[in-house]
Amino acid sequence: MAGRSLSHLQQLEAESIQIIREVAAEFGNPVMMYSIGKDSSVMLHLARKAFYPGKIPFPLLHVDTGWKFKEMIAFRDAQAKAFGFELLTHTNQEGVEQGVGPFTHGSAKHTDIMKTQGLKQALNKYGFDAAFGGARRDEEKSRAKERVYSFRDKHHRWDPKNQRPELWRTYNGAVNKGESIRVFPLSNWTELDIWQYIYQENIEIVPLYFAAPRAVVNKGGQLIMKDDDRMPLEEGDVESVERVRFRTLGCYPLTAAMPSEADTLEKIIEEMLLTRSSERQGRLIDSDQSASMEQKKRQGYF
């Protein structure tokens, strides 16, 4: 009897689950980064599948900048309660005391202090030797050249010229004390794969991904949702209610919405099949400077 061939999504699922299980077996203190977005939701689902019917054998970590959408935080807490995983949260208190924010200090400094430095603080605090991330190679050019097992030195820095070969899905997890590995089990997935898998597996995601009427401010052509009263209005800013959704999620002042009628998973998938724009075009942090994502990763960002 001929063996049953796996579908494209089943192959991706199997590869990711194998990576997650291998890290859990190989490392002494792994953690899964949980940014609450669609990729994190898929990665969480895969981790639950990998160890079912048992619990996920490592904690999930959310680095909270204090500027996430309120719906994201509510969703995070609801997911932790529903699935019973261990949720760790960390905020860079030094940044909070300094009043660091995207409006007062700019996107680059805010991202460095509240996200990159906050992440490194959390990794040092708990002594994690491996950290799962939901990055995919199709997202951005610096991520396209990153390994599944991405080696980081004792300062959490990434050197793209010092990467280990990964032949025949064989991964090298050897690290010295203080060093660590960032692991990307979704490396070979595309944005369309993510949405099709969410649809296939009926994975719950933050409602912000679905089109709905929302209060936004047009800032230089970017539609920024006014999520609270901390966003100052400047000359030329135009407030309105538009039918929009988010293709990617981050800190609300640094994440632009897009006009859309896609209010179901089927419509989002149809939109993905027709779009020719970058997934991260709404992430303002990517336009801070030339090669900004690679610079952030060299400094310790995911």
Curated annotation (Swiss-Prot):
Q: Name its pathway.
A: Sulfur metabolism; hydrogen sulfide biosynthesis; sulfite from sulfate: step 1/3
Which top-level enzyme class is recorded in the Swiss-Prot or TrEMBL entry?
transferase
Keywords, ordered alphabetically: ATP-binding, Nucleotide-binding, Nucleotidyltransferase, Transferase
Task: For this entry, list what GO says about its biological process.
Answer: hydrogen sulfide biosynthetic process; sulfate assimilation
Record carries keyword ATP-binding: yes
Region (Disordered) residue ranges read 280-302
Enzyme Commission identifier(s): 2.7.7.4
Q: Which GO terms describe its molecular function?
A: ATP binding; sulfate adenylyltransferase (ATP) activity
* Recorded superkingdom: Bacteria
Q: So what does this one do?
A: With CysN forms the ATP sulfurylase (ATPS) that catalyzes the adenylation of sulfate producing adenosine 5'-phosphosulfate (APS) and diphosphate, the first enzymatic step in sulfur assimilation pathway. APS synthesis involves the formation of a high-energy phosphoric-sulfuric acid anhydride bond driven by GTP hydrolysis by CysN coupled to ATP hydrolysis by CysD.
How does this chain assemble? Heterodimer composed of CysD, the smaller subunit, and CysN.
Task: Output this protein's name.
Answer: Sulfate adenylyltransferase subunit 2
Organism equals: Shewanella frigidimarina (strain NCIMB 400)
Its encoding gene is what?
Answer: cysD
